[in-house]
From Swiss-Prot:
Top-level taxon of the source organism: Eukaryota
Name this protein carries in UniProt: Cytochrome f
Family matches, as SUPFAM superfamilies: Cytochrome f subunit of the cytochrome b6f complex, transmembrane anchor, Cytochrome f, large domain, Rudiment single hybrid motif
HAMAP family cross-referenced by the UniProt entry: Cytb6_f_cytF (MF_00610)
Function: Component of the cytochrome b6-f complex, which mediates electron transfer between photosystem II (PSII) and photosystem I (PSI), cyclic electron flow around PSI, and state transitions.
Family: Belongs to the cytochrome f family.
Cell location: Plastid, Chloroplast thylakoid membrane
Length: 320
């Protein structure tokens, strides 16, 4: 009887341990997967500052190009494409968080005018779905459906990102008007150099925090270095920690200055931003334009016919 109780207790403890481990794994995985792509969402209410600068540039310090292509004009309640291109050399490899080299990822933020939003799945054509691929877009905030974010996604497959956009209808949204609107875009390739809390990633250059002589360089077991810098005047020692990834540029016994680079800059990526304009066109205006063009064409035709008729009359009078 005692043995059965003991076995039951052990079984219960094992079940609890497995359940706890599973819960920790799920929570950790969810936290990482949801937080990793969109650092900006955690610290900024709006991704575009009053100066026009997109906040992604605070972490991705290198300046790189980005391009956006949208139609010149769209009709109300219409699905259209906003194509964002993030060009880079596909042969490049970036430093990963563990210090190893890997392929670059890309990400983008698209800031649309108020009223414009991500198109519903049932409104997207099969051809557009094929161009979109397996991308999953999300709003920057539940209340900001006009700001869309994506990433990180594999750069080799998605250096060109197609956003399916639904234009608003002023007939149902009174705060939307038939006007020309700006669209802003930001796109990055590769990892950032600074985390949202201000700390450095391993994808940037590390500088000396003091001047002096490099006394000792210890290579860590998991990668990276501990560099001891000794001040020549008072013997004070400072230890600079270098994470795995950047290549060391100094050696023991070398004299260095304050803020001198201790490592190379491994960053091969960067961030860029751009803008475009789109006109929300009034269908009545389009119909009016078509009517005007048709009137001009008909007037030209009647003018030609009248001219030919006049020439025939003149010719008959001359023959008479």
């Amino acid at each position: 009887m005692q043995t059965r109780k003991t076995f039951s207790w052990i079984k219960e403890q094992i079940t609890r341990s497995i359940s706890a481990s599973l819960m920790i794994y799920i929570i950790t995985r969810t936290s990482i997967s949801s937080a990793y792509p969109i650092f900006a969402q955690q610290g900024y209410e709006n991704p575009r500052e009053a100066t026009g600068r997109i906040v992604c540039a605070n972490c991705h310090l290198a300046n790189k190009p980005v391009d956006i292509e949208v139609p010149q004009a769209v009709l109300p309640d219409t699905v259209f494409e906003a194509v964002v291109r993030i060009p880079y050399d596909m042969q490049l490899k970036q430093v990963l968080a563990n210090g190893k080299k890997g392929a670059l990822n890309v990400g983008a933020v698209l800031i649309l005018p108020e009223g414009f939003e991500l198109a519903p799945v049932d409104r997207i054509s099969p051809e557009m779905k094929e161009r979109i691929g397996n991308l999953s877009f999300q709003s920057y905030r539940p209340t900001k459906k006009n700001i869309l974010v994506i990433g990180p996604v594999p750069g080799q497959k998605y250096s060109e990102i197609t956003f399916p956009i639904l234009s608003p209808d002023p007939a149902t949204k009174k705060d939307v008007h038939f006007l020309k609107y700006p669209i802003y875009v930001g796109g990055n390739r590769g990892r950032g150099q600074i985390y949202p809390d201000g700390s450095k990633s391993n994808n940037t250059v590390y500088n000396a925090t003091a001047a002096g002589i490099v006394g000792k360089i210890i290579r860590k077991e998991k990668g990276g270095y501990e560099i001891t810098i000794t001040d020549a005047s008072d013997g004070r020692q400072v230890v600079d920690i270098i994470p795995p990834g950047p290549e060391l540029l100094v050696s023991e016994g070398e004299s260095i200055k304050f803020d001198q680079p201790l490592t190379s800059n491994p960053n091969v990526g960067g961030f860029g931003q751009g803008d475009a304009e789109i006109v929300l066109q009034d269908p009545l205006r389009v119909q009016g334009l078509l009517f005007f063009l048709a009137s001009v064409i008909l007037a030209q035709i009647f003018l030609v016919l009248k001219k030919k008729q006049f020439e025939k009359v003149q010719l008959s009078e001359m023959n008479f």
